[in-house]
C-alpha cells in the first residue's frame, strides 16, 4: 500500500491481478485527505470538505501546549548561542562540523539553517576534507556532497587511505571504528562515474570490519550503534527513525563529549512531533470512518495507520502538517470488468461528475471522491501560490489510468509483457508520479509557464520522480508484499524476468532486482546532489519516499514489518 502527503495517491502494487480474463482487480484510486465527496444516500455523514477547510484554517499547534513551544524556542536560542561561540572559537573546524552533523542526524538542523550555511561557507569544511584522519575527511565529504558541493570521493578523500603497493585500504584503518562508520556513510553517496567502483570497495571494506567490531566491541552502546548503522545505513534510512537511535548513542557518551542543549532540543522536538502526529492520526481515522468506503466496497483494506506512515515519512516536520492531513490517501481494490474499467478511465478523461453516472455504484462513489479531492487540492494550491494546477493534475490522473488499462489489456488478452515494458508501465502505475505532482503543487513548486513545460514533467518524467517509483515497484515486486492477500496471478517484474531468463533462479532474479534498485539510488543521488534541478524541499520528499520503501516492504520470516512497527511506536505511540 502506498500513502503519501500533499496529494492523492495510488497503491504500490497497482497492478492487474486476476485468474480469469473477464475481470480484474486494480489497486488504484487514492482518496486523499478529508474529501468532500458526496456520500451514498444510505451513509449519513458530515460534509467531508468542511474538514479540509477546518484543518487548513486552524494551526496544528493549537492542540499542543504553549509551554512546549516556549521550551523549544528557549532551547533553540541556547543552541544558536553555542554555535556562534563554537564558530568564533574554532573557525568552523572539526568540533563545529561534528555539531552540524549531530543537528542533521537529530532532525533539528532546520532551526539553524543560517548558522549552518555560515559555517559551511568558511572553508573549514574544505580544509577538513583533506585531513589524514579518516573520520574528519569522510565527515567533511558527506556534509559537502549533501550540500551540493562538487567534491571527488577518490581525489579529495579516498586516495590518501589506500596502500600504494597493494591498492587496498590501509590496514591501520581496521580498528578505527569512528572512521569506518564515516567511510560506510560516505560510501552510500555514490553518484556514479569514476568514483563508483572505489566507493563500492569502501562499502565492502567498512562493512566487513564494522561487523567484526560489533563482535569484539566491549562498549555496548557503540556496538549497538554500529549494528544499527550496518542494518540501516544513514543515507538509505529515514532520518526520523535514525534520530532516536543517534540520540540514544549521544546520551551514552561521557558528559565532556555531549551537548546538553542539543540533546534537550532534540527531545523537545520529538515530543512535539509525536503529539502532532497523534492529532493528525485522530483526524485521519475520523475522516476514514466518515468516508464509509470500507463498508461500501468489501475488498477495501482498512489500514489507516500504515497509509499515514507514508505521509509522515515523506513530509517531515511540523511545517508540513497541513499537507499530510490533506493527503491521507487510501488504496483500495476496485473490482470491475475490462469494459467498466475502460468506462471509468474515460470518465476521468472527461473530468465531469456527470460522466460517472453510468458507472457501477462503487466506481461512481470513487470517481466523485477523486474528482472532488483533486479539485480541492488545486484550489488550495491556487489560493496559497497564485496558480491553479488543475489541468496538470487532471492529465496526471489520465496518465495513471491509461497505465492501469495497459495492464488490464495485458491480462484480458493473455499477453505477457517483457520485464522492461512491465517496469516502464509500472513506474506510472506505482502512483508515485501522480502523488509527486500533487505534492509539488501543494508546496508551490514553480508552476510551468507554458503548456509544453507543464506537460514535459508528465510525459518525460525526470529522474527525481522515476527513481523512487522504480525503487518502490521493484521492492514490492520482489515478493515481499505478503500482506496484500491477493488471489490469482500476481504479475511482477520478477515473474516476467524469469520467463525471459528460464535458466536463472529466483535468487538470481532477486539479486538482479537489487542491482537495479542500487542503480536507481545512484541516479537519484546524482539528481539530488549534483544536478539539483529541483528545490531542496522537493528533493527531500523524493529521498524520503525512496527511504520509506524498504521500511514498508521488508518482511521478516514471520511476515512482520519490524522496522515499521518500531518506527510507528517511536512516532505515534504515547
UniProtKB/Swiss-Prot annotation:
Induction: By a musk indanone elicitor that mimics herbivory. By corn leaf aphid feeding.
Listed GO CC annotations: chloroplast
Entry-linked Gene3D superfamilies: Farnesyl Diphosphate Synthase, Terpene synthase, N-terminal domain
Subcellular location: Plastid, Chloroplast
Co-factor binding details: Binds 3 Mg(2+) ions per subunit.
GO biological process: regulation of defense response; response to wounding; terpenoid biosynthetic process
List of residues binding Mg(2+) 1: 329, 333
Free-text comment on this protein's domains from its UniProt entry: The Asp-Asp-Xaa-Xaa-Asp/Glu (DDXXD/E) motif is important for the catalytic activity, presumably through binding to Mg(2+).
Family of the protein in this entry: Belongs to the terpene synthase family.
Subunit structure: Monomer.
Descriptive protein name: Probable terpene synthase 3, chloroplastic
Organism: Zea mays (Maize)
